[in-house]
Amino acid sequence: PPERDRYLFRDGRGENGELPPSDWTSIFGGSAWEPVGDGQWYLHNFAPEQPDLDWNSPDVRADFLDTLRFWADRGVDGFRVDVAHGLAKDLPPEGTPLPTQAELDALPHDGQHPLWDR
């Protein structure tokens, strides 16, 4: 369905997709994946009620720009985008295994990169 194109869905693992696509954990604890009952799961880095948007979707980007334009036209002084570093996800193509939580945790984050800290 077109509305699903706005979010990050993946097929579950296991015979019938009963297992989440990866072992990723939510910032709030528990799995970062929520099942929808058809073998598919959606990603939420925070609460299940806050599904992550797919910023590769032209509709998501257009809606975001429309929202910014709406408020800019009303004279707001600026915008605060919470957790901006976590908006876009560079996921591998569907069918490619996702990295494990341990592999993700080993990556530099929060602006701490060995090259930049020299």
Segments predicted by a language model, with ranges:
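Alpha-amylase-like alpha-glycosidases and glucanotransferases acting on alpha-linked glucans and related
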Residues: P1-R118
